[in-house]
Amino acid sequence: MAPAWSFLLALLLLSCNAICSLGCHLPHTHSLPNRRVLTLLRQLRRVSPSSCLQDRNDFAFPQEALGGSQLQKAQAISVLHEVTQHTFQLFSTEGSATTWDESLLDKLHAALDQQLTDLQACLRQEEGLRGAPLLKEGSSLAVRKYFHRLTLYLQEKRHSPCAWEVVRAEVMRAFSSSTNLQEKFRRKD
């Protein structure tokens, strides 16, 4: 009987250790892949931004959703997930497939998919700790509206190379802001 209890206790301790080691450390798990996405987005550039100056547009980037002073780490994870998910969807459209280098686009999809997987694990963990959804509806809505404006702009411009260049630069801006947000939490930790 004693060996059975010893075995169960050892198994319980090992399970606890494995579960506890799955902690979500946003700045550490997300920053490097985020930089990878930025690098890939930079490499996608096909058109000189200066040749697309007439196509520039103010998409009203929701800076407050990514940089508000009241944003907590758990909410930041939700915002980052939302930005990553919409970026994945945007660069998975038929129009993007005809615009960008297929190999780079595949790498971008893989990097974004990995980020989504990591962020979803963090979301589940944080929601489990708090017992409630993390994202304030206002932040989620602001991010969704921002990406909707990008999509409408692409449709309006008929997915022209310059329109995609403008959108690529905008998405890089969103990812740069999320990197800054991560750095803010890294300094706090």
Swiss-Prot record:
One Gene Ontology CC term in the entry: extracellular space
Sequence intervals crossing the membrane: none
Disulfide bond sites: 24-122, 52-162
A single MF term (Gene Ontology): type I interferon receptor binding
UniProt keyword annotations, A-Z: Antiviral defense, Cytokine, Disulfide bond, Secreted, Signal
InterPro entries associated with the record: 4_helix_cytokine-like_core, Interferon_alpha/beta/delta
Alphabetical GO biological process terms: adaptive immune response; B cell activation involved in immune response; defense response to virus; humoral immune response; natural killer cell activation involved in immune response; positive regulation of biosynthetic process; response to exogenous dsRNA; T cell activation involved in immune response
Pfam families the record matches: Interferon (PF00143)
Principal location: secreted
Signal peptide interval: 1-23
Superkingdom of origin: Eukaryota
PROSITE patterns linked to this entry: INTERFERON_A_B_D
Cellular location(s): Secreted
Key word Secreted present: yes
Job description of the protein: Produced by macrophages, IFN-alpha have antiviral activities. Interferon stimulates the production of two enzymes: a protein kinase and an oligoadenylate synthetase.
Protein family (similarity comment): Belongs to the alpha/beta interferon family.
Protein name: Interferon alpha-B
Organism the protein comes from: Bos taurus
